[in-house]
Design a protein with these regions (language model features):
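ATP-dependent carboxylate-amine ligase
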Residues: 1-14, 36-39, 125, 249, ...
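N-terminal leader/targeting and accessory segments in enzymes
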Residues: 1-89, 259-267, 291, 311-314, ...
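Acidic, Mg2+-coordinating active-site environments of NTP-dependent enzymes
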Residues: 6, 10, 67-75, 193-342, ...
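Phosphate-binding loop of NTP-binding sites
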Residues: 8-11, 87-233, 237-248, 279, ...
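Short, well-ordered alpha-helix to beta-strand connector turns
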Residues: 24, 37, 62, 74-75, ...
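Short glycine-rich anion-binding loops that position phosphate/pyrophosphate groups of nucleotides
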Residues: 45-47, 180-181, 202-204, 235-236, ...
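Short internal beta-strands
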Residues: 63-69, 229-233, 371-372, 395-403
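Active-site regions of enzymes building and remodeling cell-envelope glycoconjugates
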Residues: 74-83, 147-150, 247-251
Length: 485
């Protein structure tokens, strides 16, 4: 039980008829979960308005409603200007502000967030004696314990609950992916980030943000909520993003020019990347077992973060040399005895697909075969762009399905094929993704690199609101076993 007054601490209350010293059993923002004595927060969302469910919450026994529009039935209410932001404030109060007990690290950007979180976690655990909580796309982790995740950044109340669990488990640091949606929808409102990291910006989520400028401005919000703002100086959106940053300290990293942390003498090899890192008077050689140029950027932002938290560059490099990569991020799926390589990557955006194919071309001794589709019910404008990238960078393209969701796979594929026009690159269309993978393997030659793009860590395919099992690691292994009998 908490007093209503305690839960509302820090809110600008516009109007109320509620007894502020009344007891509240629990906080709910889903009316279906409300029980007698609860505080129901009517959140205004993009798809639905929580105010519509106030009558249901009242029927279930809600003691008070936190809202933007006062209910007409005279029920106890507290009115605020922004109920979504209020949800974050109440969540912090409900769980006693766990973020204040740990060193918070937030990473935003179109690509690279997931890999960077794992690299930072690895360095801090090996070299700073830290117990690190991780929040991200693949999974959430409390130390070594894995928790299920449904979205990149949880809703604010659930985030506060998770952070409390991490703090109580002894976590000293938390590294989390912070999506543009999370920043715009106040899911991380009030979180005191010690370090904020910006990786890059490329075309994505324009169905939500509408323009690249708005997308950039959403990402920029993190730089007004952190003590140290670390950014990729090579990214063309960095200047705009940092223009209104209020972080007391700024720290840049670069592969191509001058910055606070620089990578030099980059060498990309099959299965790894090597380079020299320099910051101030420190220098070290870095070896990472993730074969891609963008790995250098992910490694730099991880090193920049940990260096700003007191870990020397050489210690960062030593920890990174022991890192074996991240599931579904430039992951090499074993194909012994074939002579070809299968790469699995989550590249489901134009920029990510381009970077993966460029990296594959850098070490492929034969052809680069690109197998990909595009997600249904998502930004349709990127589909022909993905097709163009595949045709321009790959030697052979297999257009297939990703997560069709409620769209017809053939319609999505038709959108992708528009981008292949004007190129002589040979291609084929195989809507069934499993059959497409089999085809790629059956026609591969020694030295080829098959890039399975789009699914990455996912072990399912989403069709008509249902998830069907589909793990590309399993598909490759089983087909290899079948064909080598």
């Amino acid at each position: 039980m908490m007093k209503l007054r305690e839960l509302l601490n820090g809110l600008d209350i516009l109007e109320t008829n509620a007894e502020l010293d009344s007891d509240i059993r629990e906080v709910r923002y889903d009316s279906r979960l409300v029980k007698s004595g609860d505080l129901f927060i009517a959140v205004t969302g993009a798809e639905t308005d929580g105010h519509k469910y106030i009558p249901m919450a009242r029927e279930k026994g809600a003691a008070c409603v936190l809202c933007e529009r006062a209910p007409e039935d005279g029920a106890p209410f507290v009115r605020v200007a922004d109920s979504r932001r209020a949800l974050a404030v109440v969540g912090g109060n409900r769980f006693d502000h766990p973020a204040r007990e740990m060193t918070m690290i937030g990473i935003t950007g179109t690509s690279g967030k997931t890999t960077s979180t794992y690299l930072i976690k690895s360095i801090l655990e090996q070299k700073a004696g830290a117990k690190v909580g991780l929040i991200g796309t693949i999974q959430n982790m409390i130390g070594d314990r894995v928790l299920h995740t449904e979205r990149t950044t949880p809703e604010s109340f659930e985030l506060q609950k998770l952070l409390r669990e991490m703090a109580d488990a002894g976590c000293t640091h938390v590294v989390m992916e912070v999506s543009s949606h999370a920043l715009m929808l106040d899911r991380v409102y009030g979180i005191p980030f010690a370090v904020g990291i910006y990786t890059n910006l490329s075309r994505d989520h324009l169905d939500f943000h509408k323009t690249m400028e708005a997308y950039c401005d959403a990402k920029a919000l993190l730089m007004r909520q952190c003590d140290v703002g670390i950014y990729n100086a090579d990214d063309r959106w960095a200047a705009r993003l940092m223009a209104d940053a209020t972080c007391p300290r700024r720290f840049s990293y670069s592969v191509n020019g001058q910055a606070d942390l620089m990578a030099k003498n980059v060498a990309l090899e099959p299965g790894c990347v090597d380079f020299d890192a320099e910051a101030d008077t420190e220098w070290c050689h870095v070896h990472v077992g993730i074969p891609a140029l963008f790995t250098v950027y992910n490694t730099l932002d991880a090193m920049a973060c940990c260096w700003n938290l007191g870990v020397p560059l050489a210690e960062c490099a030593d920890a990174l040399a022991k890192n074996h990569g991240v599931k579904g991020r430039m992951e090499i799926i074993p194909t012994p005895g074939t002579g070809y390589t299968v790469l699995n990557d989550y590249a489901h955006k134009p920029d990510a697909l381009e970077k993966v194919l460029q990296s594959a071309k850098a070490f492929a001794k034969g052809r680069v075969v690109a197998l990909f589709g595009c997600g249904g019910d998502r930004d349709k404008t990127k589909r022909p762009v993905m097709g163009e990238i595949g045709a321009r960078l790959a030697d052979f393209v297999i257009v297939t399905s990703d997560n069709p969701r409620t769209e017809k796979p053939e319609a999505i594929i038709d959108d992708i094929l528009v981008g292949l026009k004007g190129y002589d690159t040979p291609y084929t269309v195989i809507p069934d993704r499993v059959a497409a993978i089999h085809y790629a393997m059956d026609h591969a030659q020694p030295g080829d690199v098959i890039v399975l793009a789009g699914k990455g860590h996912e072990d399912y395919q989403e069709i008509d609101h249902k998830h069907y099992p589909m793990d590309e690691r399993v598909i490759v292994a089983e087909h290899l076993k079948e064909t080598q009998k």
